[in-house]
């Protein structure tokens, strides 16, 4: 069925992503994502917004300070062509965002600027460093991951493509 195919494709893609990046690569990416979230949490709170979550990895939700509306945040975000999450929980006072592996210093400062503008404040430029992680130890794994050789060999585009072609050649299906 289409649903099974869609799930299998996502699982296959995730497996190849893990194989391509390996344990060290995934840890580096995770550090990058979380560090960006930590910087955003710290800087946006300095503007008077209240962080609504105690533990986070990449997703933040902020309660808006008195006098700041979702519409003001939305308008400032749209000026920068950035989409944020606006909680429709009835209170109209929560805005969220998520970071990913592509976020950079410019985008971090743009996001901080959006929240500053909505609050009628200015924000200083912040430097983005990948070493700002503050993960709760209870959120961390204590076992080794991705120890099989496939996760430690194919870290170049050429190597990964050769590996994928090799898998394709070994495929035994009803189509051949």
Model-derived features: positions:
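Active-site C-terminal subdomain of aminotransferase-like
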Residues: 1-57
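Flexible glycine/proline-rich, aromatic-decorated loop/lid segments
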Residues: 1-12, 33, 69-88, 129-135
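Conserved phosphate/anionic-ligand binding catalytic regions in large, soluble enzymes, centered on
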Residues: 4-13, 102-103, 171-176
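Short acidic (Asp/Glu) and glycine-rich catalytic loops that position anionic groups and cofactors
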Residues: 10-22, 51-56, 88-95, 136-145, ...
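Flexible, glycine/charged-enriched surface loops at secondary-structure junctions
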Residues: 25-30, 44-55, 87-89, 122-129, ...
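Conserved PLP-binding catalytic core of the aspartate aminotransferase-like
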Residues: 47-76, 99-101
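Noncatalytic alpha-helical scaffolds and linker/capping helices
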Residues: 79, 85-96, 100-114, 121
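Flexible inter-domain linker/hinge segments
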Residues: 105-176
